[in-house]
A protein has these predicted regions:
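The catalytic "switch" region of P-loop NTPases
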Residues: 1-58
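Short, amphipathic alpha-helical interaction segments positioned at domain boundaries
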Residues: 186-227
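C-terminal/domain-terminus segments
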Residues: 88, 147-152, 161, 183-194
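Winged-helix-like regulatory helical subdomains adjacent to P-loop NTPase cores
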Residues: 58, 67-157
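Short amphipathic alpha-helical interaction segments
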Residues: 152-169, 174
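Short, Lys/Arg-rich nucleic-acid/phosphate-binding segment
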Residues: 176-182
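Short, well-ordered loop/turn and helix-capping segments at boundaries between secondary-structure elements
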Residues: 29, 33, 82-85, 89, ...
Length: 227
């Protein structure tokens, strides 16, 4: 897999973006600049509530957005701009819960199309693979993942390769027995860490990244702790 020339190219460029606080700082900078404010004098916690509702379904909204960005700055900004667009169209003074929900759904659909193409470019056998996850549970065990992959027409050694791709692109994470969910960007894009962590936990399951769940109609499970 590592011999594929383009594999993970974009993720490796963004390796430094693994800290939510760094992304939040970037968002503060972009917002301040867009509002013609002095970034050095802007406190995120003071500015954000003026632009967006503070919580969505009990979760702080900037954290909610960042958790669905795959830790990519441009994705974080896409979500915000989608939500802002819905708020503007409805003449809302700030982004409300319904605007954020619609924004995340629009972003999720864009991301689904984008990542499906990206996967197909580096692994042609994976064409349309993400669409086979439509209406599936948030958590899937090894047997369920293999069944979905086979349904997509992938078999043999390609099954393991494809699952590796899904992990590396952040589409799937690994949930261990302690309920923590680990995605590739939380282990500095070291696939070995995810695979060894899974191998050590007999009861591990794969977890769909929340970024894709709205577009795929994923059935949500109890709230997970994401690392």
């Amino acid at each position: 897999m590592q011999h594929s020339a383009d594999f993970g190219k974009e993720m490796r460029v963004a390796l430094d973006w693994h800290d939510p606080d760094m992304l939040r700082a970037l968002l503060r900078l972009r917002l301040a600049t867009g509002l013609s404010l002095d970034p050095e004098k802007v406190v995120f916690e003071d500015l954000w509530p003026q632009l967006c509702v503070s919580h969505y379904r009990g979760e702080e909204t900037s954290a909610y957005i960042i958790d669905r960005s795959l830790m990519r700055p441009r994705n974080m900004l896409k979500i915000f701009l989608h939500a802002k667009g819905f708020a503007s169209n409805l003449s809302h003074q700030r982004i409300e819960e319904t605007d954020l929900e619609k924004g995340v759904r629009a972003y999720s659909q864009d991301l689904l199309v984008e990542l499906d193409r990206e996967l197909t470019d580096v692994f042609p056998a994976a064409k349309d693979i993400l669409y086979h996850f439509i209406d599936t549970p948030e958590e899937l065990d090894q047997a369920q993942i293999e069944a979905l992959v086979k349904e997509a027409g992938v078999d043999g050694d390609d099954i393991t390769k494809l699952v590796d791709f899904l992990l590396y692109y952040g589409i799937l994470g690994v949930k261990s027995e302690n309920e923590h969910v680990h995605y590739i960007y939380s282990v500095n894009y070291d696939l070995k860490i995810l695979k060894i962590r899974a191998a050590r936990n007999r009861k591990f399951v794969y977890v769909m990244n929340p970024a894709f769940m709205p577009a795929l109609g994923t059935t949500e499970s109890a709230q997970l702790r994401i690392h």
